Amino acid sequence: MARIMSFAQQKGGAGKTTVLVQLAHHWMQAGHKVALVDLDPQGSLSRWAGLRGGVDCTASSDWKASSDIRAAARRADLVLVDCPGNADILLRATIRDSDLVVAPAQPSMMDLWALEPVVEMARKEKTPLRVVLNRVPPQGRAAEEARGMIEADLLNEQIGNRVVFQQAFALGKAAAELQPRSKAAEEVAALAAALDAIR
C-alpha cells in the first residue's frame, strides 16, 4: 500500500512546494515510485512537473481530490500531496486520508501562527504531523527561538535559506542535481531519512 504524505501550510512563502519537490527528487533517485498530487490553486507543483517532464503529477481540486489521491496510490508506493493554503474542507479531508502531514515553516512568528489550524486539524484527524523549519538563515538565533514556540512535533532536520533551491525549481530540477555535493543536498537527504523513519 502506498504511503500518502501531505505538505500543508496556510501561509504563502513558507516553501511548502519547494520542500516537496526536493524530497520527491530524492525519493525518486532512491528508487521509489513517486506520484504527485497538486491541490494548491497556484499550481506551482504542476508547473515544476511540466518543466521537468516524465513526472507522475495530477492537478486536482475539491470534488476530485480524494479519488485522484487514491488513484495515485494505486500507481505508486509514495504519494506526495501539495495541499491548498486555506484551512477548509478539502484540506481536512486530505489530512484525514494521509499517513503523515509535513508542515514547512520559516522561523518567523507569522509562519508559526499560520501553522496552528493545520496542527489542530491533524490532531483532530489523528494524523501524525511533523514541522520542518525551512529557509533558515545561516546566522542568528531565529531557528532556536522558533523551536521554543512551536507546539507540535518539530524535526531536528531543517532546510537552510539557499538560492540553489529557487534556481533548481525554476528549471524543473532539484538542488541536488545542480549541486550534488552541497549543503543543500545534504539537508534534503537528512530530512528524507527523518521522514522515512516515521511510521
Could you say what each language-model-derived stretch is?
Residues 36, 81, 103, 131-133:
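Structural beta-sheet core signal
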Residues 4-14, 21-92, 120, 166-177:
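P-loop/Walker-type NTP enzyme "switch/lid" segment
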Residues 137, 147-174:
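Beta-strand-loop-alpha "switch" segments that mediate conformational coupling across diverse proteins
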Residues 86-108:
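Inter-motif core of Ras-like GTPase G domains
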Residues 41-43, 109, 136-140, 163-164:
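Conserved nucleotide-binding/hydrolysis micro-motifs of P-loop NTPases
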Residues 175-199:
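NTP-binding/hydrolysis catalytic cores, primarily Walker-type P-loop NTPases
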Residues 112-134:
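Conserved C-terminal guanine-recognition region of P-loop GTPase G domains, centered on the G4
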